[in-house]
Amino acid sequence: MSRPNLLIITTDQHRGDCYGFEGRKVQTPHIDQLATEGTRFQHCITPSAMCQPARASMLTGLYPLTHGVIDNGIDLPPKTGDTGFASQLGRNGYHTAFIGKAHFSSYNTFSPTGTPECHQSSPNFSDEWNGPYMGFEEAQLLVLGHELKEMASAPKGLHYERWLRKDGQGQKKLALYGTKLTPDVGAIQTWNSAMPVAWHHSSWIGDRVIDHLGQREKEKPFCLWASFSDPHMPFDCPEPWSRLHHPEEVDLPPFRTRELHKRPWWHKAYVEDRSIDPELDVAIYDHEQSLHRLPKRNGRARNYNDTEFQLRHTIANYYGMISLIDHNVGRILNALDEQGLAENTVVLFTSDHGDWLGDHGMMLKGPMFYEGLLRVAMILRGPGISAGQISKEPVSNTDIAASALDWAGFTPEQACHGQSLKALLDQPSATRDFAYGEWDLNPQNWGLDLKLRVVRTTRYKMTMEMNSGAGELYDLQDDPYETTNLFDQESKLKKEFEDMIRSRPNDQITEALVPSGLH
């Protein structure tokens, strides 16, 4: 058999339990079918709870403190991006392409950075620019969806924005994203959007991926990364998908109490917004509001206090955004079938990180690695991959780079922390001890100086804050809702997890990358 094609499909801020196959009441028939036809990893975690670090790790196979993107607002250096799996595949006969949200570089920057994703730099690209970008030969990018503020000049390096504006009606179309249809219940960052689904970025990504498959270089195998930018906040689902799930029928979090007195100190500091520099924190908030069309009330979601009624509407919209993505995933998979590509294409589906979505009284994301934020889906389907299997081995999105190269018949040319998932699928006796993640918060973004490390095994999870030595340890088998912190009770187990953290390769960059913006 010839070398397989590689299709990587990712979503953004998509919890690992928000799929039909996980038992929740979200409609995902096409992704459910993908899981039925392939193997899914039940205990996959993100290497970071933030978009930019996680995506840089997915591309490079490196942990954040090694590739340097430790938080949002820090750009992945192009020379580092060019060492990722896409570049190596491209040099070895694959046609490589990226379509959708990359977020390898920051959007809202303090000054122009020269990248196509930067608001201030994108207008300087030519109308014909289609890559290369971060090792991908071809790139079709977007920012709009999360970023609802129109750019002053045409963003020629951003293809969805370019497409939306081509008839001169871009400003009017963009305004529809933030136009709220009834009912508006005042829930945080939640509304039914007036944007027609045909103009929505999820539909655009589906269309562009299908077009790319039909126009590909047929003499070469392809590696295509299709990156959907939902269900990231704001939860502004378009009709009819915003009405697909009834608020009174959605799944509510089983445990919605914060119980901060039972948690490590930084939980309370985060929720109470105890900034190390209050004036800086206000400045950050004001800058964020100037860049978004988001409601000012609880814009940063630290003091989240929506009612159950409002939370139900948020979850219904979140589900609708997922179902719209699922619809387009189905269209893409149908295109593989119609073009005779499915039998020789490895499909990998995952997300960069999750969302608290009401767990423990929290919303969105931040420095508490509850399962809703940390765990993501990992589904693989393709030649040689068993159907209907569920692996309980702990794995990470950092494994994507090594896995893509392994399926193509290569080993990483550069250092790679991730390990190929192919070995776990090919060898039933193969095991993994743990998966690892890390996040050094940028105090300028968060007002807190935290150095977080997290280790996940099949049964347990421990998070440790390295500056203070505080932490939390949960038995996810007996305590799936993470209500009882065992950190100060299980000294032997805690020591084992500390050893896992210390086993991380000592290859961190020695000079921190300078933030270019907020995100």
How does the language model describe each region?
Residues 479:
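Intrinsically disordered, low-complexity polar regions and short flexible loop motifs
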Residues 98, 432-435, 502-515:
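Bilobed periplasmic-binding protein-like "clamshell/Venus-flytrap" ligand-binding domains
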Residues 518:
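A glycine-rich phosphate-binding loop feature that marks nucleotide/adenosyl-phosphate handling sites
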Residues 1-465, 470-471, 484-499:
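Formylglycine-dependent sulfatase
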